[in-house]
């Protein structure tokens, strides 16, 4: 029986955070035995906002080394860089012609990013969800792990696939969202009602995977809790968002359940909780960074992983693009 195909990707813009790791990357690693996993570094999406060319090259290799350090195995998964497989852009253009202006106008992420990058509201930013649809549909993907911020884009990908199939027959698999059994939703350290984001301008909200562990300890010790007297370490997302966030992080790193942690911290101060979170997270990062530097310093190996990954991805992508071009009525290249 063939394994279901899973596609996911991350932009090489901005350093990945413990939120990316606990909420996504760790799930990706765990899926490798049961799914045919295709993981992409989406550098073409990254240029919808201005990038420094040297920094983009560096960030792409950094992201690849981080994927590997987190446990993504090129023997089990297809790992590649988006711009190395031209079929993504080619299918993206074709799908543009089956996507309506009004649909793209309704995308909330476009509205958010337009406000944030008001000086550079480019067509690529508007059209981003169509390229994302191409990324997914190229590989006849069965399931896509998505966070809240990308659910709307996956819905659009499904709509485009169904619209195209209604005209031309079953060319595309219609992808389903993959909802992991468990995946920590890591919140901002100082504003625990909003998600930790690698693009947050206030770096005290964020813990980067490549950050100095000493700086991480300081940030966690400054994290928001609450002013209850006496302090009570209890999981309550509504009333105690900061404490709940720290418990979620500690649970994700140690594998202990929330009830076990609540019992452990009964009668203890918030300082005890912060101390244990800081110790657990910094210990995890020291191990991860050691693996990261080993991969990052071996560019020959990274180049081989990218080359092999692009070849594997292209073999699958070219079949889908050929079927699409044939369905549309393009003359085959002699």
Swiss-Prot record:
Protein name listed in UniProt: Tryptophan--tRNA ligase
Motif range ('KMSKS' region): 195-199
Pfam families per UniProt: tRNA-synt_1b
Highest taxon of the lineage: Bacteria
Source organism (scientific name): Klebsiella aerogenes
Biological processes, Gene Ontology terms: tryptophanyl-tRNA aminoacylation
Coiled-coil regions, chain positions: none
Subcellular location: Cytoplasm
Assembly, per entry: Homodimer.
């Amino acid at each position: 029986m063939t394994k279901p195909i899973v596609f996911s990707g991350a932009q090489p813009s901005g350093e990945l955070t413990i939120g990316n790791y606990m909420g996504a990357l760790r799930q990706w690693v765990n899926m490798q035995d049961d799914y045919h996993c295709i993981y992409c570094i989406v550098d073409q999406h990254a240029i919808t906002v201005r990038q420094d060319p040297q920094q983009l090259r560096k960030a792409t290799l950094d992201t690849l080394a981080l994927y590997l350090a987190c446990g993504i195995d090129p023997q089990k998964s297809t790992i590649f860089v988006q711009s190395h497989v031209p079929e993504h852009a080619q299918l993206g253009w074709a799908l543009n012609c089956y996507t309506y202006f009004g649909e793209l106008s309704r995308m909330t992420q476009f509205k958010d990013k337009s406000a944030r990058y008001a000086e550079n509201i480019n067509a690529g930013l508007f059209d981003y969800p169509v390229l994302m649809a191409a990324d997914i549909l190229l590989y006849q993907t069965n399931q896509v792990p998505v966070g809240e911020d990308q659910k709307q884009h996956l819905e659009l990908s499904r709509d485009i696939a169904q619209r195209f199939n209604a005209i031309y027959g079953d060319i595309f698999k219609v992808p389903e969202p993959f909802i992991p059994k468990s995946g920590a939703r890591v919140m901002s350290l100082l504003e625990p009602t909003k998600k930790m984001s690698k693009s947050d301008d206030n770096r005290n909200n964020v813990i980067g995977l490549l950050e100095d562990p000493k700086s991480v300890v300081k940030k966690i010790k400054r994290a928001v809790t609450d002013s209850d007297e006496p302090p009570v370490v209890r999981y309550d997302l509504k009333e105690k968002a900061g404490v709940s966030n720290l418990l979620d992080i500690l649970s994700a790193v140690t594998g202990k359940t929330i009830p076990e942690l609540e019992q452990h911290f009964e009668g203890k101060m918030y300082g005890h909780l912060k101390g244990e979170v800081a110790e657990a997270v910094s210990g995890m990062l020291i191990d991860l960074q050691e693996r990261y530097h080993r991969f990052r310093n071996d560019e020959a190996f990274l180049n081989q992983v990218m080359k092999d990954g692009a070849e594997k991805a292209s073999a699958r992508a070219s079949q889908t693009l050929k079927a699409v071009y044939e369905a549309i009525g393009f003359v085959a290249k002699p």
